[in-house]
C-alpha cells in the first residue's frame, strides 16, 4: 500500500473526522483523482512536440497518456478541428497516492524560488488546481534529454463539499500553502 494512503487511513481521516465534526469516517473528504494536463499550443507547427510531451508525462506518471484534440477550428490561433493540442493523464488509487507523495516530498522542494502554494486556488467545491512552470522539477525527467521546458497543470479532485473542507484535507497532507 502507498505510504500516503496508509497515513491517510490511520492518521488524517480520524483527525479530520474530529476537526470537521463528522459522524461517520466515510464522510471525511478524500482525494479521488489527480489530473495532469499539458497544453501545447506550440504543437501546431511541429508534431514532434506532442511526442516529446507524451514521453515526459509518461515518465512522470508511469501511466499511458491521452492526446487531446481541438474541438473547434479557431482562425486566430491557427488551429483546425481535430488537431492535437495537448496531453493529459488521470491518476487514481495507488498511483495517485504515490504521485502525490513524490510531488510533496521531492518535486515541490526542487522548484526555484518556491514560497509555497497559493491557498486560494480552490474552485468552490473543494478541488485544488496548481501550475508547474517546468517539468524538470520531477526526478524522472533527465535535464540533458529534454527538448524544451514545458509547464503543466495539476488538478486534485476531492470529495470535499466546500473549499474549507478541501483546504483542511490538503493541510493534513502537509501541502505547503503560503497564505
UniProtKB/Swiss-Prot annotation:
It comes from the Bacteria. GO terms for cellular component: ribonucleoprotein complex; ribosome. The keyword RNA-binding applies. PROSITE patterns: RIBOSOMAL_L5. SUPFAM superfamilies: RL5-like. One of its GO terms (biological process) is translation. Keywords: Ribonucleoprotein, Ribosomal protein, RNA-binding, rRNA-binding, tRNA-binding. GO terms for molecular function: rRNA binding; structural constituent of ribosome; tRNA binding. Gene3D superfamilies: 3.30.1440.10. Belongs to the universal ribosomal protein uL5 family. This is one of the proteins that bind and probably mediate the attachment of the 5S RNA into the large ribosomal subunit, where it forms part of the central protuberance. In the 70S ribosome it contacts protein S13 of the 30S subunit (bridge B1b), connecting the 2 subunits; this bridge is implicated in subunit movement. Contacts the P site tRNA; the 5S rRNA and some of its associated proteins might help stabilize positioning of ribosome-bound tRNAs. Part of the 50S ribosomal subunit; part of the 5S rRNA/L5/L18/L25 subcomplex. Contacts the 5S rRNA and the P site tRNA. Forms a bridge to the 30S subunit in the 70S ribosome. This is Large ribosomal subunit protein uL5. It comes from Pseudomonas fluorescens (strain Pf0-1).
Amino acid at each position: 500500500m502507498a505510504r500516503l494512503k496508509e497515513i491517510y487511513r490511520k492518521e488524517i481521516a480520524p483527525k479530520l473526522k474530529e476537526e470537521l465534526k463528522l459522524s461517520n469516517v466515510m464522510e471525511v473528504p478524500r482525494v479521488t483523482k489527480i489530473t495532469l494536463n499539458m497544453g501545447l499550443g506550440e504543437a501546431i507547427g511541429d508534431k514532434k512536440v506532442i511526442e516529446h510531451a507524451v514521453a515526459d508525462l509518461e515518465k512522470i506518471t508511469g501511466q499511458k497518456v491521452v492526446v487531446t484534440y481541438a474541438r473547434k477550428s479557431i482562425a486566430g490561433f491557427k488551429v483546425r478541428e481535430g488537431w492535437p493540442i495537448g496531453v493529459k493523464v488521470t491518476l487514481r488509487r495507488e498511483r495517485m497516492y504515490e504521485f502525490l507523495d513524490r510531488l510533496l516530498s521531492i518535486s515541490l522542494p526542487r522548484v526555484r524560488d518556491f514560497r509555497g502554494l497559493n491557498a486560494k486556488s480552490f474552485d468552490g467545491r473543494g478541488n485544488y488546481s496548481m501550475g508547474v512552470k517546468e517539468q524538470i522539477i520531477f526526478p524522472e525527467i533527465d535535464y540533458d534529454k529534454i527538448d524544451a521546458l514545458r509547464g503543466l497543470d495539476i488538478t486534485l479532485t476531492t470529495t470535499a463539499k466546500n473549499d474549507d473542507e478541501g483546504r483542511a484535507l490538503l493541510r493534513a497532507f502537509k501541502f505547503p500553502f503560503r497564505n
